[in-house]
Every structure is written in structure tokens, then in C-alpha cells.
């Protein structure tokens, strides 16, 4: 069992990583006997895990209600968020309730925002079931829903009480979702840890076949890196922005193509190549290092080009609504070397458009 602490003073919390955690009531601390829980999951995961998690919580004396949401990025919306509020109020659940997010990034982000908003804030626990949510979205307290004009535009910073990562969930993950998660894994190597990127080049095949020790190390290292960044910059005023490598471009793809048509990790993968090409055009990143990124992403089964039907010009309106924009100016996350990156302002739109065009499918 691996245990990592996100250090945020009184709001510090543990990330527990192991197989078989859904069989252990202690996995869901700080829940105690007699407490009330609203378990939030989706229609795909409910048949797989809802009864198991409900059973282990009830075994610990916890009173469990549940709400099952539709599955898909297109349902990460204010309308679906309202169904969670309605379920909470119908019971009713008070300020002493705990929301448990059992699912991937959509369930986790939406449930976290519900917890931040319901009666001005109730406790919640992240139980991520996808690789992407285990290594990234469940850690750090970013909660949100989408708006038709932009991804994650309505939300709050709100930290969970704990994160429970059961590696056994990956056994039911579709290959496309596994690849999507690997995009965020590869991101950590590019922005923060060149040695980890080297390790990924050597061990990617093991991750693709869900090798237990390799996957446990991979998730642990990603969570360590994210925990360090969040502890240093919880509200993304500086260092934490680096975690958005590829996201400014990627969010544009997701919004323009319709939420759910490109998985988040797929869009981020293409976006990371666009960021690398931008950095190349600025003369601060080598084409050889861009090729290393492209090769690793392709091996993971990820796209390295934007959608054929999306012109370079179509990216700009979305990118100018990005949450990192200050005073109307884009701030891009750009690699300087494998393992080192920067936040860069003042890049001309023409250069960015040319970098996007470099990455468009033929």
C-alpha cells in the first residue's frame, strides 16, 4: 500500500494507493459509523462497483444513499449537477453529510463542485476509477462543470478529505480510456521529471498490459509530483499552471468538437504536441525532443494531430477564453526540455496558428 499526503495545513489529506481497497472499510476514512453519505457514480460504473462500495461502507456503520448519473463528458453540466442537489435535498442531507465521488474525472469534478456548493460546503471523498482521474483530476481540489462556451468554466477550488485509489478498477477500463489517462501520465514527465519520462519510455508496454508493480509506481509518482505542486501553489497563481501543458489547445478541441467526441486525454495529447511545436518555433525546444514526445504518445495509442475538420483559426476563440488568460493575453505552458517547462505570455497569434497548422492531420 502506498500513502501520499497532500500537505495543505489543516486541509491536508491522504492519497491511498493499493489493490483491494474496496474490500476494506478503513479505506474510506475519515468516515465513521453513524455518518451519512451520498454516493455519486454513473450508469456505467454502478453495475461494477456501487454495491461493493455501498456494502463496505454499510459494514462500517455508514448510512448510504446514492445517485446515478448518465455517463459522458457531455453530462458534466449544470443540469446534471442540479440532479445531485435534488437528490441531496429530497432525503434531506444536512451539512454533516459526505459526498463520495465514485468514478472518473466527470464524476469527480462534478461531485466535488456539488460538495463545494451544497449548503456552502460539505465534506467529500474522491474514489477515482480511471487512470486519468487517479493520476490527475482527483488530486488537488479543482472541481467544475462545463459550459457550452468552455470546459471547466464554472467551478471552485475545494479539496477532498481523502483520495482512495483502488488499482483493481483499471481492470475494467476500456483501452481508449487507459490511453487517455496515459496522456496525463506522460505530461508529468514532460513538465517536471525527465527521469520519469525516461522510465515511461522503458516501461510503457508494461503499463499498457496493466502490470501491477509498474502501474503502482506510475500512479504513485504522478500523485507525488502533483501533491508537491498543489502544496506549493494550491490556487494556480504560478507553478501549478504548468500542470496545464497541452490543455489550452486541448480544451479548444473538446469544446469545438463537442464534449465527449474527443476524450480529454486525447485532446491533451494533441495539445502537448502543439505546445512543443510552439516552443520549437520560439527556438527554445528541439525537434528531436518533440519527436520523443510524439513517439511515446503514439505508442500509447494517442493522437498527435488535431482534428482534420478543425481549422487552426477555430482554436483561437476558445484559447482566448482559457482560464489562464490575463488582460486578454494568452498564457501558454511550453516545454523547454524534457522535464522542464514554463508559463509564457506574449506569443503572437500568428506563431501559435502556425504551430497548430504543423500538427493538423493531412
Curated annotation (Swiss-Prot):
InterPro entries (alphabetical): Dehydroquinate_synthase, DHQ_synth_AroB, DHQ_synth_fam, DHQS/DOIS_N, DHQS_C
Location, primary (coarse class): cytoplasm
EC number per UniProt: 4.2.3.4
Binding-site residues for Zn(2+), renumbered to this chain: 184, 247, 264
Any single biological process term in GO: amino acid biosynthetic process
Chain residues that bind NAD(+): 71-76, 105-109, 129-130, 142, 151, 169-172
Reaction(s) catalysed (UniProt annotation): 7-phospho-2-dehydro-3-deoxy-D-arabino-heptonate = 3-dehydroquinate + phosphate
Location in the cell: Cytoplasm
A Pfam family matched in the record: DHQS_C
NCBIfam families xref list: aroB (TIGR01357)
Protein's UniProt name: 3-dehydroquinate synthase
Organism of provenance: Shigella dysenteriae serotype 1 (strain Sd197)
Lineage: Bacteria, Pseudomonadati, Pseudomonadota, Gammaproteobacteria, Enterobacterales
Gene for this chain: aroB
